[in-house]
Amino acid sequence: MKKVLALLLGLGIAGAAGWFFLAWDWPGPAPAEKTVLIAPRTSLHAVTEQLAGAGTVAFALPFELQLRARGLGPQVKAGEYAIPAHASMAAIAAILVSGKSIQHRLTVAEGLTSEMVWKLVKADPVLVGDAGPVPQEGTLLPETYLFTRGMTRARLLAQMAAAQTTFLDAHWAARAPGLPFTTPRQAVILASIVEKETALPDERRHIAQVFVNRLKQGMRLQSDPTIIYGLTRGYPLGHGIRQSELDGATPYNTYVIDGLPPGPIANPGKDALLAVLNPPPGDDLYFVADGKGKSLFAASIAEHSRNVSAFRATERLKTPQVPTDSVRQAVPRLPRRK
């Protein structure tokens, strides 16, 4: 009888042990993906209780024992984790040990001012801490930035500034010869104007060519976005540019100042920066909208005047009143020489 009991006990222990280890790979109970945030310095017991409470494992104790038996307890890392539906204990353990937290993202569009970017960072609910002062205009690189929950706002802004520095350092030495600017900062200033002049990627380099040619010939840039920045620091003007604003003496108004304005008017993207560092060859000095969403370029004032007339004719077919939200488009003026 004792032998039978011993045999049964042994079979029971073996069965329990088999169940214990086989259960490691069984599908879990979660019907859908769950997000679990493990705070730093959380005990292993609390972690498994949290996972059971979230419904990702059936019971806390078996999972805790599994982790301890396999020597994985000390390797569990704090973080924010996405646990797939029906993930096994083995799969969940691999996620917790990997430390690969959920990657959140913040996309900074080309052409935003530093204050606009700063406000985006301040409003992001995943980031923590104070954003600090508004970064200097034009020092941030538009990009999609990935970060984990708990990253500080100040650190992300610093990362954006470092990204621009790295990009400029990588491309400044390969710039075209004979450009009418001598520092990376001046390149950023011109690139910011190019960025605000067009949303069309295939026009950026051509517009950069026009502005580079104008600077080389001592012609004023006469860029409408510089007027707007001087008045609103990049926010919408709310009306078409008026003659008084066109003639207004702000430091950024390139209709009245020679050369580049004192600083960028936005944060230019990589394409705009590359466009001013390596503009395509050509002699164009003017551009005007074609009324169909693109621009017409010209090397002579006569050709430019024909393009302006064509634009105005197109606008008359659309509406009896020519819109004046862009002086460059609606009432182009002849560039003035120094």
Stretches found by the model and what they are:
Residues 43, 119-128, 133, 138-338:
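Bacterial extracytoplasmic/cell-wall-associated proteins, especially those involved in peptidoglycan
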Residues 4-19:
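Hydrophobic membrane-insertion alpha-helices, especially the h-region
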Residues 6-10, 54-55, 78-80, 256-261, ...:
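N-terminal start-of-chain detector that recognizes signal peptides
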Residues 19, 23-173:
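Signal peptide-directed extracytoplasmic domains
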Residues 9-12, 35, 287:
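N-terminal hydrophobic or amphipathic segments with adjacent small-residue motifs
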